[in-house]
């Protein structure tokens, strides 16, 4: 329970920072209707959607915002899905992301301790179409070459092969 409360708190803090700075944010799911920011004109609340619809929406979005939950040393499928759908992934930092991605080249990251800098990072992407396309293209190539389920299966098979030796 405490874990879930923390995740909701962090996610709402990120959204609050963006909408209070004038950035419009589309969110999905009925739980947002209970948010203290539900009446903010910059928070656009949509109904729940399924996984496939989520991928379609990512493909139509210039930016896909991700907030990591408990795995601060890894990454989530949402990051790869955003990249594979040509959407700039904006996510909080993890040790894995910092080691495997390049800020401003194939991902945009933010630090939760400096959340006040996030709106400017998002505005920069929204205002610079060339930058957006540059990040999207690089992210797509990175995800396609390193972060598909086939890539993961090959990696696990390699590990298993090394264990058998």
Which stretches of residues belong to each language-model region?
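Catalytic binding pocket for nucleotide-activated donors in carbohydrate/polymer assembly enzymes
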Residues: 37-164
């Amino acid at each position: 329970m405490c874990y879930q409360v923390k995740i909701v708190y962090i996610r709402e803090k990120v959204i609050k920072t963006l909408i209070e700075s004038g950035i419009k944010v589309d969110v999905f799911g009925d739980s947002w209707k209970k948010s203290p920011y539900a009446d903010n004109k910059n928070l656009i609340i949509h109904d729940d959607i399924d996984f496939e619809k989520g991928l379609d929406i990512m493909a139509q979005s210039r930016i896909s915002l991700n907030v990591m939950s408990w795995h601060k040393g890894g990454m989530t499928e949402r990051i790869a899905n955003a990249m594979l759908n040509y959407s700039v992934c904006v996510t909080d930092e993890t040790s894995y992301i910092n080691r495997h991605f390049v800020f401003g080249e194939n991902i945009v990251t933010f630090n939760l301790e400096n959340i006040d800098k996030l709106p400017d990072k998002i505005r920069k992407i929204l205002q610079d179409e060339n930058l957006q396309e540059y990040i999207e293209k690089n992210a797509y190539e990175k995800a396609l070459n390193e972060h598909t389920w086939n890539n993961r299966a090959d990696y696990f098979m390699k590990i298993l092969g090394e264990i058998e030796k």
